[in-house]
């Protein structure tokens, strides 16, 4: 299928296959540059968001965070990606984040599919098949206390 290709659905209606979108919505801290610029976008926005999420998990804040939303948008579009220290963000993580947070969606890690990300050296110790089959044991299981008797916390 190619962008703009029309297919006939089983109910005889025509459907146009699209690979990019133009709508603008999302959490400000996680918006990819192409969204802010009003450009069409692809799945590469999801890889940008993954980069923002991983950055926040490692450092405590999104990479371009600012209390002022307009300043945050400017930073997303223009400011260089910086890291607090190598103690917090090791070199393999820096490389992964730098490539996920590439402002050019065509050069962004993952632009050619998820296998690109899964093969990054940051994930070298992950057996993706084992993960998919849920064969990894968690390093800890939180003791979940539920205030809602109708919900099973497990």
Say what each PLM segment does.
Residues 1-23:
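Activation segment/activation loop of eukaryotic-type protein kinase catalytic domains
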Residues 59-62:
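Structural helix C-cap motif within protein kinase domains
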């Amino acid at each position: 299928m190619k962008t703009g290709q029309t297919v006939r659905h089983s109910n005889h209606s025509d459907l146009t296959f699209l690979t990019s979108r133009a709508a603008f919505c999302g959490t400000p801290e996680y918006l990819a540059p192409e969204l802010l610029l009003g450009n069409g976008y692809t799945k590469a926005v999801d890889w940008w968001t993954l980069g923002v999420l991983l950055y926040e998990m490692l450092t405590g804040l999104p990479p371009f965070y600012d209390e002022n939303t307009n300043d945050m948008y400017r930073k997303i579009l223009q400011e260089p990606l910086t890291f607090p220290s190598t103690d917090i963000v090791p070199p393999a993580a820096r490389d992964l984040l730098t490539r996920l947070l590439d402002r050019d969606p065509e050069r962004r890690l993952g632009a050619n599919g998820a296998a690109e990300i899964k093969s990054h050296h940051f994930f070298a110790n992950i057996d993706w098949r084992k993960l998919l089959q849920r064969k990894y044991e968690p390093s800890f299981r939180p003791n979940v206390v539920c205030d809602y008797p109708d919900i099973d916390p497990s």
